[in-house]
Amino acid sequence: MAAQIPESDQIKQFKEFLGTYNKLTETCFLDCVKDFTTREVKPEEVTCSEHCLQKYLKMTQRISMRFQEYHIQQNEALAAKAGLLGQPR
């Protein structure tokens, strides 16, 4: 059975998600939307927005992978150090 995440942590995670979403929306909007003379979204604005989002998602994925790799290396180093310390001389 999965452990429940405390409500305070759920709220914190949701606030972080909203902050990230708002930052991404603002960044892509400012980069992609330049013309306010029409109500319609232009095809180039759609394409730009899609590329902006894809780039952000790929970047986030790469950062997460590097973060995991770093933690694995740190854990291996700690395990090796603990193994050396635990051996009699």
UniProtKB/Swiss-Prot annotation:
> Where does the UniProt annotation locate this protein?
Mitochondrion inner membrane
Main localization is mitochondrion
Record bears the keyword DNA-binding = no
Recorded topology in the membrane: Peripheral membrane protein
**Keyword Thylakoid part of the UniProt annotation:** no
Q: SUPFAM superfamilies annotated for this entry?
A: Tim10-like (SSF144122)
Kindly state a single biological-process term from the GO annotations of this entry.
Answer: protein insertion into mitochondrial inner membrane
Output the InterPro entries linked to this UniProt entry: Mito_inner_translocase_sub, Tim10-like, Tim10-like_dom_sf
User: Which parts of the sequence carry N-acetylalanine?
Assistant: A2
Residue window of motif Twin CX3C motif: 28-52
What Pfam families would the database entry show? zf-Tim10_DDP (PF02953)
According to the lineage, what is the superkingdom? Eukaryota
SS bond partners: C28-C52, C32-C48
Q: What cellular component terms from Gene Ontology apply here?
A: mitochondrial inner membrane; mitochondrial intermembrane space; mitochondrial intermembrane space protein transporter complex; TIM22 mitochondrial import inner membrane insertion complex
Keywords carried by this UniProt record: Acetylation, Chaperone, Disulfide bond, Membrane, Metal-binding, Mitochondrion, Mitochondrion inner membrane, Protein transport, Translocation, Transport, Zinc
> Listed GO molecular functions?
membrane insertase activity; metal ion binding; protein homodimerization activity; protein-folding chaperone binding
Family under the similarity heading: Belongs to the small Tim family.
Comment block on domains: The twin CX3C motif contains 4 conserved Cys residues that form 2 disulfide bonds in the mitochondrial intermembrane space. However, during the transit of TIMM9 from cytoplasm into mitochondrion, the Cys residues probably coordinate zinc, thereby preventing folding and allowing its transfer across mitochondrial outer membrane.
Q: What does this protein do?
A: Mitochondrial intermembrane chaperone that participates in the import and insertion of multi-pass transmembrane proteins into the mitochondrial inner membrane. May also be required for the transfer of beta-barrel precursors from the TOM complex to the sorting and assembly machinery (SAM complex) of the outer membrane. Acts as a chaperone-like protein that protects the hydrophobic precursors from aggregation and guide them through the mitochondrial intermembrane space.
The entry's protein name is Mitochondrial import inner membrane translocase subunit Tim9
Q: Which species is this UniProt entry from?
A: Rattus norvegicus (Rat)
